């Protein structure tokens, strides 16, 4: 399939020179040499056969999950127990188990960061796979983290029983002790709560309730609480937009509570009304990589960018403007052009703000209001990120003054993401409700184990007009309880979790009967009327951009806010943009890298090593932080992903990466930093060099006008091969006898590159479906990652053959410049998996006939025949073996 973009010129899109990454530039000769070799040269036999770290272990090196404490033993026992009472299968009406036949149950996930309505695939009473609930009225899609969440159920690092002063105890004793610590000076601290049943239990408990999020949207929520009287964020309807301008809002990645990838893909179908996408951002995000136009702006410039766009629109409609600092000359014209396009698009325009700033949000919301945007909906709010930084700051002050003596934390690892709270932990008695003894629960006097969402009754009201339920698909693997039952018990209640959820469904006036609600997983409820008004722009004060080096934090596709910090699938998933797995690292522009003496180099065995730096912010220093030189990164701005640097996550997550929140609290968007290169070298787990395209034409892409007006045969010619008979097609240039497919199906699959955003959800889903093993960082560095599906990312360069002819550039100089990246390169994603070739090269070279061709055109593998020669991998032109 072709990739269609709305703005690139025909010459640029048809003949872009793409390069795999910065490694191609640092050592092109070595990179080209590695491209010709499937295997790295310097992997010794000893390295291949063993691992020193596991030499004394009886556990197989390949059995990574078992070594890290993930086991299905508990699941086997739990599945042998009686079926969950009142669970309703989604598809198979009789609740009976047939060996080998899967049952599907509708459920919902909310962990304080992600919300999704899902279908849970179970076999023999065990959850094994998460599927999207396409019938859901709100966020029925899944991302990589939601897909990976099923593995967390089997994590042996979860709490197995209540803990009191570090020792296991009974629920009765733990609850009694916890209740004794609760006084009128106690506070319940949670992440955002969207469960009506849990809210009722919290109200019954009677404690002061403070909610704070690890990735804060508090200042944005403040704007709409003041405007509508309800705390939440506006919902987005991309189907109604024709032009979206996102400023720091990675809406295809982690921004917002909705998963907008499906809506984006639908809106990007080539046609006269195809959605145009413009992105302004500091670091290259998933949204920026998919944008038609990308403007590089520092995070501290976001407010200025939004202010200039607002002023242009305000002038056009005749309302007052706001005072704003001048824009940099290199982006001024681009921003003005965006404003003109927004005005022309009118109600089809959509402006999104990703900065946790009331000023930025007001500017974006008011611009949408002036344009009468149909895609920006403030009457239907999203409640999944409504924590309050103001309330949390007040709590910290009360702890300092001694006004708060005990804190109950519920499903929030606040001592990890808040350095301020961590410094005050000794001043209060802690009671923690959590799934594991994390950094917060390990410091608690009482720790109460909370069940995984796949073994608990839950409900959720994630947005206006939506009510969802979650049902257990397996009995609890350990001695844990659902959050709503724990809080209700602390409040003196005795109801079971299912009774509490049933009562909540009734009080929410769900539109479906109980059994139908469980079957579907969701129901409509009446949308609460919100106050309508207009934003007051008189108090808007636009901040001046920082002059020094800017430091900001961001989230990665696999890790998110860090809720899955002991889940190996989230670590092993390569970042869609950097193509690195397992670590977090500072992303830095090439210009800044030169200034600070930072470099990333490809090693002779194909691995990547780079410089580390010490980052200092307000006297606090993070030492030996690895740096990745990222094309498209704005000069003068560096970013570091949150969720890493754990010490009490479990065997997988402990000591992986650094904790970015030690330098920057979630409530703060950015700050000025100083950087000094250190002498420590860091080894990256890079997968991009491990899979090359052997110098062949990689991407077919065309601009929209040519796509709509031209004949496809003119720009998408079928490849031919030269022969003594003249050019031959692939079918004509056939050295083998044709396969016999007359008596059966002939399967085919194609991927629409215009729809693929590179999010990586399919990579994790493939690993789940096929039981693909996790191998760990060391093995990834040795190019032994086991993903059956990968999503290659390629950058483009501005130099093309046509440009060279126009400028009179010679051949040698032309090819040299083709290897030089643009400062803001275009990005394309290409999923690659087994192509099930008609005459698969892997089949012809296998010495034991382990790879065979089916009569339905599929490439089959007999694992018990394979002897591990890897001739198939050597002979695979797509490098997916």
Kindly label every feature range from the protein language model.
Residues 2-329, 336, 580-584, 591-595, ...:
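N-terminal export/assembly segments and adjacent metallocofactor-ligating motifs
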Residues 55, 319, 476-529, 778:
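N-terminal leader/propeptide and maturation segments of large enzyme subunits in energy/redox metabolism
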Residues 507-580:
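Long, low-complexity segments enriched in small/aliphatic residues
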Residues 244-245, 277, 294, 407, ...:
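Short, well-ordered beta-strand core segments
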Residues 293-399, 508-510, 514:
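Active-site phosphate/pyrophosphate-binding segments
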Residues 254-273, 418-432, 466-469:
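A short, gly/pro- and small-residue-rich
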Residues 289-295, 449-451, 466-476:
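Short beta-alpha connecting loops at secondary-structure transitions
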Residues 436-470, 786:
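Flexible glycine/proline-rich, aromatic-decorated loop/lid segments
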């Amino acid at each position: 399939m072709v990739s269609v973009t709305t703005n690139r010129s025909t010459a640029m899109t048809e003949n872009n020179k793409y390069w795999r990454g910065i490694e191609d530039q640092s050592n092109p000769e070595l990179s080209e040499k590695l491209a010709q070799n499937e295997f790295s040269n310097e992997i010794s036999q000893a390295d291949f056969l063993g691992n020193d770290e596991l030499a004394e272990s009886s556990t197989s090196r390949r059995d990574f999950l078992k070594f890290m404490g993930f086991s299905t033993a508990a699941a086997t026992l739990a599945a042998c127990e009686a079926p969950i009472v009142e669970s309703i299968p989604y598809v198979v009406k009789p609740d009976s188990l047939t060996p080998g036949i899967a049952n599907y149950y509708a459920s919902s996930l909310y962990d304080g960061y992600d919300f999704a309505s899902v279908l849970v695939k179970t076999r023999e009473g065990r959850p094994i796979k998460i599927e999207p609930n396409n019938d859901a009225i709100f966020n029925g899609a899944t991302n990589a983290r939601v897909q990976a969440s099923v593995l967390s159920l089997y994590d042996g690092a979860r709490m197995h029983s209540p803990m009191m002063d570090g020792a296991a105890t009974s629920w009765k004793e733990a609850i009694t002790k916890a209740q004794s610590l609760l006084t009128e000076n106690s506070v319940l601290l949670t992440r955002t709560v969207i469960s009506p049943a849990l809210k009722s239990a919290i109200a019954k408990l009677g404690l002061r309730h403070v909610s704070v999020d690890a990735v804060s949207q508090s200042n944005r929520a403040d704007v709409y609480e003041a405007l509508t009287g309800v705390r939440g964020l506006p919902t987005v309807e991309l189907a109604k937009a024709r032009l979206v301008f996102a400023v720091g809002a990675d809406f295809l990645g982690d921004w917002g509570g909705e998963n907008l990838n499906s809506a984006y893909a639908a809106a990007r179908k080539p046609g006269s009304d195809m959605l145009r996408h413009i992105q302004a951002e500091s670091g290259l995000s998933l949204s920026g990589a998919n944008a038609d136009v990308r403007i590089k702006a520092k995070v501290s410039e976001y407010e200025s960018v939004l202010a200039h766009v607002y002023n242009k629109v305000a002038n056009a409609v005749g309302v007052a403007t706001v005072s704003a600092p001048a824009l940099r000359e290199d982006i001024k014209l681009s921003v003005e052009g965006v404003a003109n396009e927004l005005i022309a698009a009118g109600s089809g325009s959509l402006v999104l703000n990703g900065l946790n700033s009331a000023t930025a949000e007001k500017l974006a919301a008011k611009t949408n209001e002036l344009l009468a945007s149909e895609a920006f909906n403030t009457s239907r709010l999203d409640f999944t990120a409504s924590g309050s930084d103001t309330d949390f700051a007040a709590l910290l002050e009360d702890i300092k003054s001694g006004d708060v003596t005990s804190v109950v934390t519920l499903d929030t690892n606040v001592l990890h993401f808040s350095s301020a709270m961590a410094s005050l932990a000794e001043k209060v008695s802690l009671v923690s409700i959590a799934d594991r003894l994390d950094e917060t629960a390990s410091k608690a006097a009482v720790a109460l184990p909370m069940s995984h969402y796949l073994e608990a009754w839950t409900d959720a009201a994630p947005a206006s007009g939506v009510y969802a339920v979650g049902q257990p698909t397996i009995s609890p693997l350990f001695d844990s309880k659902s959050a709503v039952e724990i809080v209700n018990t602390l409040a003196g209640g005795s109801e079971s979790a299912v009774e509490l959820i049933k009562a909540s469904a009734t009080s929410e006036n769900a539109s479906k009967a109980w059994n139908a609600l469980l079957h579907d997983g969701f129901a409509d409820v009446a949308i609460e009327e919100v106050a309508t008004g207009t934003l007051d722009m008189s108090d808007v004060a636009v901040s001046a951009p920082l002059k020094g080096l800017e430091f900001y934090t961001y989230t990665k596709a696999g890790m998110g806010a860090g809720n899955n910090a002991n889940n190996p699938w989230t670590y092993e998933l390569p970042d869609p943009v950097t193509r690195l797995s397992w670590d977090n690292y500072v992303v830095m522009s090439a210009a800044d890298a030169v200034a600070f003496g930072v470099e990333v180099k490809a090693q002779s065995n194909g691995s990547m090593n780079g410089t580390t730096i010490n980052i200092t912010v307000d006297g606090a220093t993070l030492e030996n932080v690895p740096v990745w030189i990222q094309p498209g990164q704005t000069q003068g701005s560096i970013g570091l992903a949150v969720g890493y640097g754990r010490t009490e996550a479990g065997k997988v997550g402990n000591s992986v990466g650094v904790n970015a929140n030690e330098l920057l609290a979630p409530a703060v968007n950015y700050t000025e930093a100083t950087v000094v290169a250190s002498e420590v070298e860091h080894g990256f787990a890079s997968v991009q060099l491990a899979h090359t395209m052997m110098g062949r034409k990689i991407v077919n892409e065309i601009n929209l006008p040519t796509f709509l007006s031209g004949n496809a045969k003119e720009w998408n010619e079928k490849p031919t091969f030269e022969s003594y008979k003249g050019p031959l097609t692939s079918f004509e240039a056939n050295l083998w006898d044709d396969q016999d497919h007359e008596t059966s199906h002939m399967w085919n699959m194609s991927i629409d590159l215009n729809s693929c955003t590179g999010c990586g959800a399919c990579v994790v889903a493939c690993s789940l479906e096929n039981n693909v093993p996790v191998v760990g960082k060391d093995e990834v560095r040795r190019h032994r990652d086991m993903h059956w599906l990968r999503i290659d990312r390629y950058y483009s360069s501005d130099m093309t053959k046509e440009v060279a002819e126009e400028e009179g550039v010679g051949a040698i100089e032309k090819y040299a410049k083709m290897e030089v990246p643009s400062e803001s390169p275009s990005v394309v994603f290409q999923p690659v998996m087994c192509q099930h070739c008609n005459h698969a090269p892997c089949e012809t070279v296998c010495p034991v006939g382990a790879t065979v061709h089916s009569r339905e055109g599929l490439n089959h593998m007999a694992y018990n025949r394979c002897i591990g020669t890897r001739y198939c991998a050597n002979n695979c032109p797509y490098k997916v073996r």
